[in-house]
């Protein structure tokens, strides 16, 4: 089972991630991790923090000579902005008398609920842990599983279809060709645009909408389209709720800050149509023995992968920190006031696509790995047989002519 944990505050010394359960023998480079971190920092509409930070992961354990060794992989991403926050975010020195407490919650944020839940007298701890800055650690963690899946022929990619009032009228004409080449080709094409949209005219309109929102002191949300290609039929299961692939993927996507909705394929559009216009008909023939002319199920039927590209759509709400603030009240005095502004982005939808790619990899929540275990097992069964042969040969003083690519999986 692969799982990960993150730690760290937005303005603390560093973010960290521990990935547990990675198979031994998975080839990795520093670029596999840091390239994904760089992608997360891109995107039109980002705030001033991106000019301060240049995220790079420092691997502390679990990798040797460019391959995982089966033990937990620990990584740290330093926060350059920490030097400006050593007093208000000090771990042990009690500087509370020098620091002005934040007692005005921002509507739409975790400020109020976190303040009440944990019994704080200052909102700062809530702000710093609930911040989407934490997703840098998740992208680093997800990059390990992405490298593993890539070696199994599975690719993950995304693009943006909607930013605020601007939407692509239909799926890009190039989408089928890009998916045939693998979802990473789709991601590479999207990355050419500062808003990660495929259509140039739509990209320009989205940039203009972001500029207008910034001028108005407002923010914009949008819709992320995630695709997973190369997934064989049968990943997931209908047998138990915690092995359902669509459930696991939806949970992973919904764990991302500011994501408020998720669907597999065009699910909400399908809900308005009769079944005869929704379900993907089956035809004998083709390379895999069957073929379909449509993929309205989004690559998942009966909570299992159908062998078609998996398609996940995620709705991101507008960021809650507004230059032109909404009404709130002071928790210390109960006085009605305008909400406060915390340095933030105007639009982070392009970056959300990168985070979504990371969390759908099997290093995301435990159910996702449970769903994929059967397929991973079948893909690696030859390696497992070789492990037994290696032991048998070792007893005889012999050596295998071919070593398994992946030696063990917990």
UniProtKB/Swiss-Prot annotation:
GO cellular component, one term: cytosol
Pathway assigned to this chain's UniProt record: Metabolic intermediate biosynthesis; chorismate biosynthesis; chorismate from D-erythrose 4-phosphate and phosphoenolpyruvate: step 7/7
UniProt superkingdom: Bacteria
GO BP terms in the entry: amino acid biosynthetic process; aromatic amino acid family biosynthetic process; chorismate biosynthetic process
InterPro entries membership: Chorismate_synth, Chorismate_synth_AroC_sf, Chorismate_synthase_CS
Residues bound to FMN: 129-131, 257-258, 302, 317-321, 343
Keywords (A to Z) from UniProt: Amino-acid biosynthesis, Aromatic amino acid biosynthesis, FAD, Flavoprotein, FMN, Lyase, NADP
Binding site for NADP(+): 40, 46
Cofactor requirements of the protein: FMNH2
One Pfam assignment: Chorismate_synt
Note describing how the cofactor binds: Reduced FMN (FMNH(2)).
A molecular-function term among this protein's GO annotations: FMN binding
Substrates-to-products reaction catalysed: 5-O-(1-carboxyvinyl)-3-phosphoshikimate = chorismate + phosphate
Keyword 4Fe-4S part of the UniProt annotation: no
EC number(s) on file: 4.2.3.5
Subunit structure: Homotetramer.
Its biological purpose: This reaction introduces a second double bond into the aromatic ring system.
Family: Belongs to the chorismate synthase family.
Name this polypeptide is given: Chorismate synthase
Originating organism: Chlorobaculum parvum (strain DSM 263 / NCIMB 8327)
């Amino acid at each position: 089972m692969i799982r990960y944990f993150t730690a760290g505050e937005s303005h603390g010394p560093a973010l960290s991630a521990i990935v547990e359960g990675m198979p031994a023998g998975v080839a990795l480079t520093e670029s596999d991790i840091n390239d994904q971190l760089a992608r997360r920092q891109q995107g039109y509409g980002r705030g001033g923090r991106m000019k301060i930070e240049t995220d790079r992961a420092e691997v502390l354990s679990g990798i040797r000579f460019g391959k995982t060794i089966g033990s937990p992989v620990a990584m740290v991403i330093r926060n350059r902005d920490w030097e400006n926050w050593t007093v208000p975010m000090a771990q042990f020195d009690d500087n509370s008398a020098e620091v002005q407490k934040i007692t005005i919650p921002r509507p739409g944020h975790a400020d109020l609920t976190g303040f009440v839940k944990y019994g704080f007298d200052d909102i700062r701890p809530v702000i710093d842990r609930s911040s989407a800055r934490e997703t840098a650690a998740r992208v680093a963690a997800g990059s390990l599983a992405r490298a593993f899946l890539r070696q199994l022929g599975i690719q993950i990619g995304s693009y943006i279809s909607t930013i605020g009032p601007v939407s692509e009228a239909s799926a890009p004409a190039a989408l089928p060709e890009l998916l045939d080449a693998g979802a990473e080709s789709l991601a590479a094409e999207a990355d050419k645009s500062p808003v990660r949209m495929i259509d140039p005219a739509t990209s320009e309109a989205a940039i203009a909408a972001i500029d207008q929102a910034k001028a108005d002191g407002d923010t914009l949300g949008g819709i992320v389209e995630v695709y997973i290609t190369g997934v064989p039929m049968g990943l997931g299961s209908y047998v138990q709720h915690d092995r359902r692939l669509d459930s696991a993927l939806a949970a992973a996507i919904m764990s991302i800050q500011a994501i408020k909705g998720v669907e597999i394929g065009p699910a909400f559009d399908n809900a308005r149509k009769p079944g005869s216009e929704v379900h993907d008909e089956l035809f004998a023939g083709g390379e895999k023995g069957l073929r379909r002319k449509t993929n309205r199920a989004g690559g998942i039927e009966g909570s299992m992968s159908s062998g078609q590209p998996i398609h996940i759509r995620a709705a991101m709400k507008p960021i809650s920190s507004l230059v032109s603030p909404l009404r709130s009240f002071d928790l210390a005095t109960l006085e009605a006031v305008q909400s406060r502004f915390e340095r933030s982005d105007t639009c982070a939808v392009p970056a959300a696509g990168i985070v979504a790619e990371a969390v759908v990899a099997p290093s995301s929540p435990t159910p996702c790995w449970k769903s994929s275990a059967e397929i991973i097992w079948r893909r690696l069964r030859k390696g497992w047989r070789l492990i037994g042969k290696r032991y048998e040969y070792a007893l005889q003083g012999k050596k295998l002519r071919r070593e398994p690519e992946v030696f063990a999986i917990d």
